Amino acid sequence: MAGLRIIFMGTPEFACPTLRKLIERGEEVIAVVTQPDRPKGRGQKLVPPPVKALAQEHDIPVLQPLKVRTPESVDEIRRLAPDLIVVVAFGQILPQSLLDIPKHGCINIHASLLPRYRGAAPLNWCLINGETETGITTMMMDAGLDTGDMLVKRAIPIGPDEDAQSLHDRLSQLGAETIDETLDLLLAGKLVREKQDDSLTCYAPMLKKEDGLVDWTREPVQVKNQVRGFTPWPGAYTFLDGKTLKLYRVAVAGETGEPGEILRVGREGILVGCGSGSILIQELQLEGRKRLPTAEFLAGFRLEPGTRLGEAGSVEH
């Protein structure tokens, strides 16, 4: 039996397991719509999005409109006559004229338990806010931002030391499993739509680099969660002698000291005063150097207790 005629819309690595799942299921993926190739690295060479590379491996036609909302792009998608559009981390807002094209609508895979954490960076904000559970929601798309009817929800626990990279990888796989379940229900005529309760929502805006600056007056658990949510990108950071110091792995500690003051330096890490306690820095990266476990970093860098971490150009000794 021929599968559904599906257009897949997605861009980063996060979206790839779902596209693979659609191919494995035998659905007829008639096109992939993804963002344009972007210049990367020192040579500014154009690099295709991961979804484009995967589509080309399977000889699936690829469309890369600068703006999918233009009448030309919408008409091109209309001519393909899809039964369904599946969207995962595409990176552009779809106009109503596009949402109306497929007979089964447009299904989005969102990396949170809606209606909580609508927006561009749900898995990061779950970590920053210290949540212990998140998941995947499939939803029927409407013209709002992650406001459509919910279809299938799958929840997973968040580990106490889990960072955004680890959670990204797990949710990416869970997204593929959830679309599998969603399409089975759709084909069986058993898909149930549930309205979102707007009173329960919270927003997860795109991360900005400057949001990663550590405020050492905050409580240790808040700083730890900030580091978890910002690892690996854009990175939580402070300053050491005017240079950016990125923090990739930290632990909460009980000793107290002045906010931002290095209290102790040892193989187990760098202990820094923070709020009503302290933070043990276990993995870091100083500007111009590689990301390293703290013990390896200290083997080639002398750091004295009493040094103050803080804003650029205002480092105290």
UniProtKB/Swiss-Prot annotation:
GO terms for molecular function: methionyl-tRNA formyltransferase activity. Its EC number is 2.1.2.9. The keyword Protein biosynthesis applies. (6S)-5,6,7,8-tetrahydrofolate binds at S112, L113, L114, P115. It catalyses: L-methionyl-tRNA(fMet) + (6R)-10-formyltetrahydrofolate = N-formyl-L-methionyl-tRNA(fMet) + (6S)-5,6,7,8-tetrahydrofolate + H(+). One of its GO terms (biological process) is conversion of methionyl-tRNA to N-formyl-methionyl-tRNA. InterPro entries: Fmt (IPR005794), Formyl_trans_C (IPR005793), Formyl_trans_C_sf (IPR037022), Formyl_transf_N (IPR002376), Formyl_transf_N_sf (IPR036477), Formyl_transferase-like_C_sf (IPR011034), Met-tRNA-FMT_C (IPR044135), Met-tRNA-FMT_N (IPR041711). GO terms for cellular component: cytosol. Keywords: Protein biosynthesis, Transferase. It holds the Pfam family Formyl_trans_C. The keyword Protein biosynthesis applies. PANTHER family: METHIONYL-TRNA FORMYLTRANSFERASE, METHIONYL-TRNA FORMYLTRANSFERASE, MITOCHONDRIAL. Belongs to the Fmt family. Attaches a formyl group to the free amino group of methionyl-tRNA(fMet). The formyl group appears to play a dual role in the initiator identity of N-formylmethionyl-tRNA by promoting its recognition by IF2 and preventing the misappropriation of this tRNA by the elongation apparatus. This is Methionyl-tRNA formyltransferase. It comes from Geobacter sulfurreducens (strain ATCC 51573 / DSM 12127 / PCA).
